A protein has these predicted regions:
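Conserved beta-propeller blade repeats
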Residues: 1, 8, 33-54, 82-103, ...
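Short, conserved, GDST-rich strand-edge loop motifs in beta-rich repeat architectures
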Residues: 1-13, 54-63, 105-108, 147-161
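Alpha-helix-centered segments that form part of catalytic cores
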Residues: 2-30
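Hydrophobic beta-strand positions in blades of beta-propellers and related beta-sheet-rich domains
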Residues: 16-20, 64-68, 91, 112-116, ...
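Multi-bladed beta-propeller domains
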Residues: 21-37, 69-87, 116-132, 162-167
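Loop-centered beta-sheet repeat module
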Residues: 29-77
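Loop/turn-rich, solvent-exposed surfaces of beta-rich toroidal or solenoidal domains
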Residues: 98, 103-115, 126-167
Length: 167
């Protein structure tokens, strides 16, 4: 597919909001309102007060993709400080809520890494190097992971520098 629209939308700096909706009462509350492409909000399992979300766009143009915020709009914080040429993606909560796991990879390198962020301690740590795959999910307590295969990423502006050689 052509990700040109993805790039164009990023550069428009669209007005985006994170909103919670109480399905019983219909009440909606705006948590965050920005002229930045926000996406992929996910509540922390077993904790309705912590939400992960992303600054969306081509990964090589976004300064820091993954963020956390409290449900009341306070304590906005980066999950990971990106290194130059680093992309971080495919974030998900460990189902027990202990950490947000994600994939990290560097421009010009084949290796990908599983990392996790503990929202209670603000600790971001390397778990292990992984085969080139894309979407991951873990079992309940995060000791087993499953992932699908992946080729070269297309969600970056500079696709030539992020080639993955598959077997």
């Amino acid at each position: 597919s052509d990700w040109k629209i993805f790039l164009e939308f990023y550069h428009k700096n669209p007005r985006c909001r994170l909103i919670t909706i109480d399905l019983e009462t219909g009440n909606a509350e705006v948590i965050l309102d920005r002229n930045t492409w926000l996406g992929h909000p996910i509540f922390r399992p077993n904790n309705n007060d912590t939400i992960a979300f992303c600054h969306e766009g081509p990964h090589d143009l976004v300064d820091a993709r993954m963020w956390m915020i409290n449900r009341d709009g306070t304590n906005e914080r980066k999950v990971h400080e990106h290194q130059p040429g680093e992309s971080c993606t495919h974030e998900f909560w460990i189902p027990d809520g202990s950490a947000l796991a994600y994939v990290s990879y560097m421009k010009g390198q084949q290796q990908r890494y599983i990392r996790k962020y503990n929202p209670d301690t603000d600790e971001d740590s390397l778990v292990m190097e992984m085969p080139a795959c894309s979407h991951l999910m873990s079992n309940h307590n995060g000791i087993l992971y499953v992932g699908d295969g992946s080729g070269s990423p297309v969600d970056v502006k500079d696709t030539c520098s992020y080639k993955i050689e598959n077997d």
